[in-house]
Amino acid sequence: LRCELDRLLRVAHPKAFPYIAIIDVANTCNLRCPYCPTGRRQSSGRNKIFIELDTVRRMLDDVGKYLVSVNLFNWGEPLLNPKIPEIVELIHSRGIWTVLSTNLSINNKKVLEDLCDAGLDFMFVSISGSSQETYEEYHRGGKLDLVLENIRHIIQYRRDNNSKNPIVELKYLVFKHNEREIEAAKKMAQEVGVDLFRCVHAGGPEWAESELGRGQALLGRLFGAERCKQLWQALVLNSDGGLAPCCYLYFKEDDFAEYNGNDIAEVRQNEKFVLARKLFDASAIRDLPTDLRHPCLKCTLVHEQPHLREYLKENPEAVRGHRTGDA
């Protein structure tokens, strides 16, 4: 509650600690999704592909008591990390909810069973079509039949072990080119036995032209600009131990700090974090340097804040780009 109050009041120096952790356990992927920098094989500048188990353990020792859930995904495919079952088991042993998002186009039934045994609570499985032809237009290199086979295997393994976990949600990434297959995908989800089915916008150039994209744009105009939540709610840890302010910053150069077993609470009070929070507080605009150089100045959320319009016009560093920081 204190964390949410700090967020609503846009407190620059929050007293409460984030209750969500986002850990990028694998900075690599087996697919080549065109709107993802990892899929495009764009270097993030990081020297470690997989996060180390000891790094996760140190983080939990430091802040685990505050965490409600840990999302074990961000820029890569988490199932490629050979330690992923151990990471899930470690977090689960602390009584923390574990969430994983995967393309599930991977030929490894053993890791699926190990994740179930480790106590994984929730699994998102992303697809972008009900036919292979449509699916592979975005999920390049993926095999839809393999994804569905793996889902069936997880569901059957749950039944065999009298377990309801992990809860499996089939997440349909919506683009203009695949809206026509949404209904077929819903039926497919029922047939394979997933617990939940959901359509989500996929971003990218096509998103603004899709029906869902136009609907979200209208909501934004009606209810005002969205403000950042992750600066208060989330702890974001990259595969090499870099600490980011949110899950949208991809490049190493945009990290706010390094985690080497140091005090995370203290790190989150450094100048970069404080200035980022002040960007969303209209009363703190006078505290912002006129020539501020900051990764958040590329963020679409920052550029949508009414109180920053004049400030951003006058700052040559404030070039609007993608929320990954890719201008």
Where do the language-model regions lie?
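Short, well-ordered alpha-helical microsegments
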Residues: 81, 107-110, 178-182, 244
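C-terminal accessory region of radical SAM enzymes
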Residues: 156-167, 191-192, 196-226, 242-306
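Generic structural signal for small/hydrophobic residues in well-ordered secondary structure
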Residues: 21, 25, 29-30, 52, ...
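Cys/His-rich metal-chelating microdomains
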Residues: 28, 32, 39, 231, ...
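Conserved alpha-helical substructure of the radical SAM core
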Residues: 1-122, 133, 137, 141-149, ...
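Conserved C-terminal portion of the radical SAM core fold
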Residues: 65-73, 93-101, 117-129, 145-214, ...
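Short loop/turn motifs at secondary-structure junctions and domain boundaries
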Residues: 14-16, 225-229
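Short histidine/acidic/glycine/proline-rich micro-motifs that form metal-
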Residues: 76-78, 105-106, 172-177, 254
